[in-house]
């Protein structure tokens, strides 16, 4: 006999591709940026929302400042707002630009390709 989960379905996740533009030198490291994002999210939406959203950085290029953050689907607009509110990370002034929201990491990573790159439809 197969056991059923009583709690319901596993929450779906969305992946938001973003780019960090640093005004003071190189972009911050992954840990510095994740700490700044969590702090802004906590201040804007509270501890309960932060716990339910479970934001985490699944991909981050420290040289370019590009990355992907995973979040529970119901909180995707919260993470977009929090990304826009991040102004300091690792002691540097930064501006975070959300590029694309996707249902898969692979789809989010496509946002980093150049517009004429293969697989993007030449758009």
From Swiss-Prot:
The record's Pfam families line, in alphabetical order, gives:
RNase_P_Rpp14
The catalysed reaction is: Endonucleolytic cleavage of RNA, removing 5'-extranucleotides from tRNA precursor
Give the GO molecular function terms.
Answer: ribonuclease P activity
Q: Which Gene3D superfamilies match?
A: Ribonuclease P, Pop5 subunit
The Gene Ontology biological process terms listed for this entry are: tRNA 5'-leader removal
Q: Which GO terms describe its cellular component?
A: cytoplasm; ribonuclease P complex
Q: Keywords on this record?
A: Hydrolase, tRNA processing
EC code(s) of this entry: 3.1.26.5
HAMAP family assigned: RNase_P_2
Query: How does it associate, per the subunit comment?
Result: Consists of a catalytic RNA component and at least 4 protein subunits.
The job of this chain, per UniProt, is described as: Part of ribonuclease P, a protein complex that generates mature tRNA molecules by cleaving their 5'-ends.
Q: Which family does it belong to?
A: Belongs to the eukaryotic/archaeal RNase P protein component 2 family.
**Protein name (Swiss-Prot/TrEMBL):** Ribonuclease P protein component 2
